[in-house]
Amino acid sequence: QSITTYSGNYDFYLREREIRREQLLASYRRQQEMLAKEEDFIARFGARVSHAAQVQSRIKKLEKIERIELPPEQRVMRFEFAEPPRSGDDVCRLDGLGKIWLQPDHTTRQVFNGLTGMIRRQEKIALTGRNGAGKSTLLKVLAGQTEPTAGTVTIGANVQVGYFSQHSMDLLDGEMTVAATVQAAMPQANVGVVRNLCAAFLFQGDDVDKKVKILSGGEKSRVVLAMLLARPLNFLILDEPTNHLDIQSREVLLDALQQFTGTLIMVSHDRYFLRSLVNRVFEIDHGQMRIYEGDYDYYLEQVAPVDVPS
């Protein structure tokens, strides 16, 4: 146990405590990523004589590192989500998919064309590409929020789709409380289960009785994500789910999605999030789609500029 002193009034204390928590969580997260990389290297090359010195060096390095510990109040409460219903093995097929948007000046813009691919059960896919490449548009098409201009999307057998975007928050009923909103997503659940889910998404105590209309953007995001994960959905389509979320909320969401046994495709600029989650990458570039059969680190290796010998 340790005592931390704050030189200021109570408002200053609250602000400063939050800043320190964020800094500690950021340091913890960086260290966890570094430890994972080192442990991965040791696991991959531990049996190779040619790498013996490097492996031993890294083992010693890990032994000397002082682990960052989070105080108990910052540890994430885990919620055991119900197993989603099993879908067919082929979750979503894209055949020659194209999309053209009509611009305000009545001209047209082709976003992408001829996209073809298959999303299979239990895949967790990152959808990448530069800004304006059409990532959000593709997710809207997959979720049935807009029709493709060409080609087809075929959703597989027993697939239940859940879609999250920044506009999802606008659909919440501002007069309902957090608890009532989450309860509506899981009507058969008792009050204890609902409160546990709210707590897992950082709504504790009186927070569950707040009306949605007074929540911040990040809090509304957490409500929508809690509702999505409470429902019996087995194909999640997520457009920037970590926007507006602080570090602790992102850890909560990451833990929930790592537990999730359904299928997932998402857009996110959070590389740590993608590294920790996805096992396949779809990249949209100049209206076409490339598919990378590996995790996010594999994708980064493939697209990294090649060093040309001078």
Predicted regions and their residues:
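Amphipathic alpha-helical coiled-coil segments
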Residues: 64-73
